[in-house]
Amino acid sequence: MSWKRISMSAFLVLVTKAVVGAIFFGLVFTDVHEGAGTAFRAEGTENHGIAMVGYVAWSLAFSFVFARGFENRGWLEGVRFGLIVWLLYFVPMTLGIYGYFVVGPEWMLSALISGLAEALACGSVAALVFRNAPMKTAAAG
């Protein structure tokens, strides 16, 4: 496990998450997101700094867990890891938001779809960073 690779992966995963999120909620699902009404903070009142801390932590954790058990297995392993993350993170979070906030089923469906795209893209990026990772060698003793 190389901290240099983990750092590189975390940065690229963070950028990938931001790009995919911007594409889906900034371009594809704009009407759905705007229709959420009072469920979310109004434009200009968001706490971007707090959100960024969460995104950085998520990207670091994503990359660290990937490095601990999924490196050197090819891009399909990244897709599988992304699917696992989607099931463990995006699905429960989205259903929880739908259950407790004033959002419609269209928002829930769009969040599940964009979350799947984010998780699969981030898993693929991590797999590219961790391909052919240096093999661990036993310490000379």
Predicted features along the sequence, with ranges:
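Juxtamembrane/disordered regions of integral membrane proteins
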Residues: 1-141
